Design a protein with these regions (language model features):
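Polytopic membrane enzymes that build or remodel cell-surface glycoconjugates and lipids
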Residues: 1-189
Length: 189
């Protein structure tokens, strides 16, 4: 099913395409789409799959630096954090094992969502484009791996601890409700 881009729509509603085990069916259509495009570009040439994994990992490392710049002062601490992320042996699995692409794709969209949300919150005026991008990236993270649901408590924690004070609990709930609903639809669906 990965050998034809015509199967891509089915990746979004057939859970048996990612996992053949009926008890542990995982929903990761974005990963399947990336594999299908990889196959379409270079068939089964393993090197191309590794190049894609390395490219996604490089983007993730840059996003770690960008997130670090939000919370750490100076240039060096975020840069060191990004380099540790890029070079740490624990992350080599994500680059080396083609089947681990779900982690890196999830991280790519998770970090993008968090970054857009943080920039939207730090803007003087509420930024609808940034919040919309954050929600779309969150959906992408969920379509990559289920661990992305942890973005919701992370945003709640950051609202409480780092971002400018929220005027009321009602405002906080209003801001986080779309993220909670996306996570709920993913978990229940």
């Amino acid at each position: 099913h990965l050998r034809s881009v015509e199967n891509i729509p089915q990746f979004f509603y057939r859970t048996d395409f990612f996992s053949a085990d009926p008890r542990g069916r995982m929903y990761r259509p974005l990963v399947l789409v990336s594999y299908a495009f990889n196959y379409g570009l270079d068939k089964l040439q393993v090197e191309s799959y590794h190049w894609v994994n390395m490219g996604v990992h490089a983007l993730n490392s840059a996003l770690v630096i960008a997130v670090g710049r939000l919370f750490l002062s100076g240039l060096w601490p975020p840069l060191v954090a990004g380099l540790i992320f890029a070079l740490h042996p624990i992350n080599s699995e994500v680059v080396n094992y083609i089947s681990s692409r779900s982690e890196s794709l999830c991280a790519l969209f998770f970090l993008t969502s968090f970054l857009c949300y943080a920039y939207a919150r730090r803007a003087e005026r509420w930024s609808v484009p940034l919040m919309g991008t954050s929600l779309l990236a969150f959906a992408g993270a969920l379509l990559g791996k289920s661990v992305a649901v942890t973005l919701v408590p992370l945003l709640f924690f950051c609202e409480w601890r780092f971002f400018s004070p929220v005027s009321s609990l009602r405002t906080l709930i209003k801001r986080l409700t779309p993220f909670f609903l996306f996570a709920l639809v993913y978990v229940v669906g």
